[in-house]
Amino acid sequence: MQIKEFIGSTVLDKNANVVGKVDNVDFDTETGKIETIALTLQKNIFTRDELEINFDDIQTIGAYVILNKEIETETEE
């Protein structure tokens, strides 16, 4: 998978809850390994937050990015 295909992918936590979408990828320029991914969390139609995840917290990358941990996101009512 190329980075441009990775950006915009839906991210799920280990309980299959939608966490957000991949917004950016930071990688080590010497090794080429991904270090962190930045997620955009959409609370509602007008509010967005960002979250940074370590690459070690990713279980699977495919149709979805699945994390190996639970992420709690606050929702506004």
What feature does the model see in each segment?
Residues 1-77:
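Peripheral interaction segments used for macromolecular assembly
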